[in-house]
Amino acid sequence: MSASPAKDDRKTGKKMEVLIYTKSNCPFCEKAKAWFTQHGFGYTQVLLDDEEQRLAFYQRISNGREVRSVPQIFIDDKHIGTYNDLMAISDTLIKKQGGLMEFSETYKPFHYPWAVEITTRHEKAHWIEDELDLSEDVADWKGGKITPVEKEYIINILRLFTQSDVAVGQNYYDQFIPKFKNNEIRNMLGSFAAREGIHQRAYALLNETLGLPDSEYHAFLEYSEMADKIEYMRKADTNTLRGLGLSLAKSVFNEGVALFASFVMLLNFQRFGKMKGMGKVVEWSIRDESIHVEGNSKLFKAFVKEHSRVVDDEFKKEIYEMSKDIVDLEDKFIDLAYAMGSIEGLEKSEVKEYIKYITDRRLLQLGMKPNFKVKENPLPWLEWVLNGADHTNFFENRVTEYEVAGLSGNWDDAYAA
């Protein structure tokens, strides 16, 4: 007899007792054990390799019907039957246990404690746009410190940035929160969605402080490189389990790749003591989006564990195609941003290589294999800038000196797999 830990009944807190009678070299026995393992159910296995013992067992449980095969499965002392009988009630079992897509009847016990931890960490890093000081940015902008080419470069990025955060926020409210009803998960997603609203207001404040007209908020529609990005970020079909899983994967690319190209291009100015208020917005946003990517990656893994039947070679292929699509869209946007000329300290080719690097990191976070084979960060200065509070020779007003309620940590985490 062998056993794996029994699983809590998520609605009652009781252990679900699973007993599987098997024999050696039984493919369906292995399938049954694998199903319980994949969905987090513990079980006890009883081997019936002795034929006489097995026949006596069949007779004992027959109860008026012929029983001639293994596995034979019992749950809480109730005879379920064979592997096929298990598959017939598999969705019911998952639903009984609660799961990601079921309402939580009680606040505790927590069934996804990682989501509670991520939400707490995210809230400790809370900030609002009113905390920003953009006075030096205005002086840089109007005083000649920012060249005409740099201004057009920044404007092209800001044209899209606010709308990108609108798209990400809408995806939480429209695609995910209605589907994921577990309380811990909803609290996490709700926290993420609310922070996207702060991002929108922060970048809008930057636009307005620099004197950009309201027309810039819809100017992105005039550029296919921008409009195509927004359309791609919004496109999803969450009406099926398969579609919902793919939408979760895309959310990791939306926040962990599409936004990061713009982050890098704007953060480069921080290296030269320019646009330091903008640098604050970018750094705080990077911290937020890195937490969002972590949470959504873990949610994706939990989802495919609970609904493992959606995962096949075609499902994986679609995610790899998604990663290629996001890189292609970013390449076109980067070309547009650099259309007016080069930028001090950051070549277009470097940004494109970085996008491939960060996309591979996101694939790893999803449990996939790297697709672009860029193992080293092509922009090593990022770590120096993002960890600026540790460097005494950095300019005086370092953005990473900002801390609120434990807003501290290693910036390398933003780029870790």
Model-derived features with residue positions:
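N-terminal leader/targeting and pre-domain segments
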Residues: S2-L19, K96-G98
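Local sequence-structure signature of Cys/Sec-based thiol-disulfide redox active-site neighborhoods
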Residues: K11-V46
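Short alpha-helical
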Residues: P27, E52, I198
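Thioredoxin-like thiol-disulfide oxidoreductase module
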Residues: L48-V67
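Structural micro-motif
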Residues: G64-F74, Y83-N84
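Non-catalytic, surface beta->alpha helical segment in thiol-disulfide oxidoreductase systems
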Residues: I75-K96
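Non-heme di-metal
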Residues: K96-A417
